[in-house]
């Protein structure tokens, strides 16, 4: 296979894009919270697996090295990206220390993973977990350019080429090492790496157990329960990575087909891949997604965006990160939920359908794959705000940031995704600064973008990456406005309930009816007892008291709960009012935008005493409604408890209620 790189777009070196504005504030909170401290909360699980090969033995000796490899590797991958995208000097120093310790722990044969003598080196998680740690080191190399780091990772990949040759391979997650192999191949051109990758594809083609083969990817069928939802989210870019390194176009089509059928069948309105009891499932109002799947899907979309140059992958990244990712984080960045759902009226130790504790908000759980991946998702998203193409700089995803590129500093000032205006300021910071050609992504949901360059309105194409016919230089100010029209989305849940509930979007944001919350902290069940200042949280809904006796109160609850709402079938976006309340500060705590939506009370659609969030009840596809119920919706990411998918009220019933008033 000829060494080539078919990627249309390329990332800038790690650290050349820094967070600013609300995103800078969020990264600072994360550094003070989980991002900067998880390795201290669970040292055996997170801090030491790669530096001393000591892991948390509570998992059992068979699982400890593999789970430690995955969890520690993904944490340090996120930690390193967080350090360099925030520019925090202490975080950067700790990243240096970790990388140096890992290299000092390298075996003579080049192996850098977490397995020790006596462990099963052909365990599936040796390949999968080790790839996580090696990707962390590659991120560090990307930021520092240290050749010894690249050589060490290269040597570790060659260890797998030698020791996992032929059919000495596994069928579950081990093949994810292909991602790391292709990255190292792109940096070294070592054909042995691509030969290993090709042999892995051949092995899975003959021994597929989880629909992970090229044939399964190319098939029009998506089989629910065929594989872990997070694994699917993580692997859809894998064939395309091979294509980028020289494989034929069948590999690219395999990834694109996996993306299309996953989006059609298993993508929730919040942008999360379904993970019902952690496995792929049909979409539904209360179907959960796992935080790992959120991070992995964002990563896969980013790789597909770079390989193909197509802007719609960036649209999807924003949907996933601004909704699913933000809606599963405590706003002080000190806890996340392992599993979350579009409709959720409680997030507690008993509310998940999958397992006890999976919806609770916690900084760390006994198997901390999701907490560590929550550290990585935002820095990785930020890295895709500006990409380099052959003809200049492409602004892809949008968030406030500062981009340093070829002697030019470009500051993006914006309240996006809440507000519509993005201001790009160009400033020369080096003697070798050059004029820049820039393209700006126009989201598919925006049909009337406006652009002003240095005070004068200019024409702009309305789709794809819009090229501005101007060489940007010192002092230029470019203002891009992306009008955010309200959109009504109808879920296609025919593989589940055929209820076709409605959701409301504006721009990239899903808007939800917030359920009043009460947060109750408790010590939790972490593997290592949490120190002072750290807790698990059960989040319960607040229901106003009726003042009636205990029996009448049971009947009155359906009138007192605030989330028993339906939307009219045929609801028009023109009926929805957008309000900018002028709020400044941290927007995920206090959204500057809300939507006023005409709703209707559905007193019999929601259980009055639920122990879990249930699908809203309907009869013949419609909710019974008895009065108008004006709704105020806020961004999904501003909520922990919410209703995002509303049952439909029949038009004739709605018209009757309107007539009565």
Predicted regions and their residues:
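Amphipathic alpha-helical segments of tetratricopeptide repeats
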Residues: 103-104, 158-162, 202-206, 244, ...
